């Protein structure tokens, strides 16, 4: 396909060797970028209330970034280093310290992740970032920070909408199922759901017009 794909590689799947192997396979699969985070493996979701978010050492994660870059054959795949220092409550200084080390290890982009309900923390972090690597943001918990505001920072080059489509789908499914149960039939929701033809078209298949 023509649209670049960003692959979430979690923590790199274990050791440096695992990370390098995954990076090689993902490059061969024509991924546009892979994102690796500095949490310990296995990990919990960054947004899980009360979740534990221990991080690996800077040296260990820098090794994973270097391994991912060295595994590339074409050099066309972008490696995004995601630091969870803000998620872990370690503060902006630690997030910046880690980002600097990851850039030195070869990261093409830096992702600062925050679960703060306001954009203040992430805005301050980006403002203080002095590295050359551009920044990626994930405005899941701080939706008030829009793209024009990010562009104005001059350092943000990618925005990842990590779960908005999943949450939209969940809400739509719940509403449709509720309507079916209330009306005891599917007629009431027919104009709110995608035609079967459209579903198959998304898969590159064709269906007779009558379906």
Set out the residue ranges of the language-model regions.
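Extended, intrinsically disordered, low-complexity segments
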Residues: 70, 165-211
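Alpha/beta enzyme core
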Residues: 1-140, 145-160, 168-174, 178
């Amino acid at each position: 396909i023509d649209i670049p794909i960003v692959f979430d590689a979690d923590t790199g799947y274990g050791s440096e060797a695992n990370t390098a192997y995954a990076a090689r396979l993902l490059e061969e699969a024509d991924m546009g970028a892979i994102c690796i985070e500095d949490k310990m493996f296995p990990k919990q979701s960054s947004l899980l209330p009360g979740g534990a978010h221990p991080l690996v050492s800077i040296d260990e994660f820098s090794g994973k970034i270097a391994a991912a870059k060295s595994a590339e054959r074409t050099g066309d795949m972008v490696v995004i280093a995601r630091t969870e220092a803000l998620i872990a409550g370690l503060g902006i200084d630690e997030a910046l310290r880690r980002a600097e080390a990851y850039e030195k290890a070869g990261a093409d982009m830096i992702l600062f992740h925050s679960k703060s309900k306001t954009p203040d923390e992430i805005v301050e972090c980006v403002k203080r970032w002095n590295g050359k690597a551009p920044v990626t943001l994930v405005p899941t918990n701080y939706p008030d920070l829009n793209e024009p505001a990010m562009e104005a920072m001059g350092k943000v080059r990618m925005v990842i909408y990590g779960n908005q489509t999943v949450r939209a789908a969940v809400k739509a499914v719940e509403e449709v199922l509720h309507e079916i149960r209330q009306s005891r039939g599917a007629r009431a929701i027919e104009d709110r759901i995608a035609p079967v033809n459209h579903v198959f078209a998304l898969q590159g298949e064709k269906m007779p017009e009558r379906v």
